[in-house]
Amino acid sequence: ADKRPESSSDRQPEDISNGPTVAFAKDAARENDVFVQVSLYEQVARDDGLGFNTAVLVAPNGEIAAQTRKLHIPVTEGYFEDCYFAQGPSDNPYPLHRIAVDSADINLGLPTCWDEWFPEVARNYGLKGADLLCYPTAIGSEPDHPEFNTRPLWKSVIVGHAIANGLFIAAPNRTGMEGLIRFYGGSFIADPFGRVLVEAPEDEEAALVAEIDLSHRQDWLQLFPFFATRRPDTYS
């Protein structure tokens, strides 16, 4: 969404059940016997012609295991997402998906990109008992401030969410050029202790693998009991 649509034909949403992105993910999941997460421009029936930016998780059997619509839509220069995407619905905005992986069950949240800047998102998922958040991301240079590198800020904010909410967070980001935007990659996985377990370079694609111990979430929240000592009576 690096340019404004000039006509409805510039918008190319897809059906979430059988569109090309999900079809690709289903094939990849079955062929490799893994879960595959993708994000796509979901087609919905709306009077304004907008769709949703939706994260989808496909199981190894090729079936859709989870999906979540992006809540927050940026209006920053060069990222014309509000011309394509509607805000995600406010009913059940933070769905938690229980996914069986090997011998463990993981409580998974699937917020998207701009959602990762908002502490309320990670906090709500943390309070609901999420173990892992996966933020599919497309962030890079700022066209109106090309000298400003936001990558360190992006990384710091997400790692901070992991610490404050006792979460594992995977933040895959694209790389390469599109229009005026240079996407700065740097995908990473962080743990509740604020450690970056693995990280990709800025300028090339990479496959990241990390082993996570879900018990570390409770270890961290026992050491720093943020949830137990909250004061929601003072927050409104």
PLM regions with names:
Residues 1-13, 136-138:
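Short, conserved active-site loops that position catalytic residues or coordinate cofactors/metal ions
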Residues 2-3, 56, 67-74, 188, ...:
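Short beta->alpha transition motifs characteristic of CBS
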Residues 4-5, 145-149, 179-187:
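Histidine/acidic-residue-rich catalytic or RNA/ligand-binding cores of hydrolases
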Residues 14-17, 23, 27, 45-132, ...:
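Active-site catalytic loop in hydrolytic enzyme cores
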Residues 16-43, 163-174:
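A short, hydrophobic beta-strand-centered structural micro-motif
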Residues 38-40, 53-57, 95-97, 187-189, ...:
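Short beta-strand scaffold segments in enzyme catalytic cores
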Residues 88, 168-236:
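C-terminal beta-strand edge segments of enzyme domains
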Residues 152-160, 165-168:
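Catalytic phosphate-donor-binding core of small-molecule kinases
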